[in-house]
Curated annotation (Swiss-Prot):
Family of this protein: Belongs to the NusB family.
Record InterPro entries: NusB-like_sf, NusB_fam, NusB_RsmB_TIM44
Name of the protein in question: Transcription antitermination protein NusB
GO cellular component, one term: cytosol
Length: 171
């Protein structure tokens, strides 16, 4: 994973994305910043809207994002985190508690879980695919597969539908 100077994760490869996709990526980066630096939700949203979304930062041009989508994800994850984390924990394998995951992976899973829960108007396949793509931008190993499996399990629990996952059974 690459980092920009402030320590925020940045994708490995540039890719085209729609405004909601860019908002999802920015939300993951903002959630990472909040987790690592202890930045508050109002501060991080204001920073991203004023200085990052659609702006040039340290020679890197940020793509235009849907600011309302960005705000909704960040604020929604913060508001629902106490409900989301136990759901994510249940969807992980028993030897991988949420606390063991790095901050970027936690941010991806929290944002994806929130969208599955709160944005019933967005198809499950779109949400899962978008967050798997975000994981692929940061990781080259098994993490994108983990994101796919966890979000698919959560979709089954939250929405009663999935892209093929089976619920995790405790032995």
């Amino acid at each position: 994973m690459n980092s920009i100077p402030e320590g925020r994760p940045t994708p490995n490869l540039p890719r085209t994305a729609n405004k909601r996709g860019v908002a999802r990526l920015a939300a993951v980066q903002a959630l990472f910043q909040m987790d690592v630096a202890g930045t508050g939700v109002m501060e991080v949203v204001a920073e991203y809207e004023a200085f990052r979304l659609g702006k040039e930062v340290d020679g890197t041009q940020y793509l235009d994002a849907d600011p309302q989508w960005f705000r909704a994800i960040v604020a929604g994850v913060v508001e629902d985190q106490l409900k989301l984390d136990p759901m994510i924990h249940q969807a992980l394998t028993e030897d991988w508690p949420l606390s063991r995951l790095d901050s970027t992976l936690r941010a991806i899973l929290r944002a994806g879980a929130w969208e599955l829960k709160a944005r019933k108007d967005v198809p499950t396949a779109v949400i899962v695919s978008e967050y798997v793509d975000i994981a692929k931008a940061f990781y080259t190993e098994d993490e994108p597969k983990l994101v796919n499996a966890v979000l698919d399990r959560l979709a089954l629990v939250i929405r009663g539908e999935s892209r093929g996952a089976k619920p995790r059974h405790k032995s």
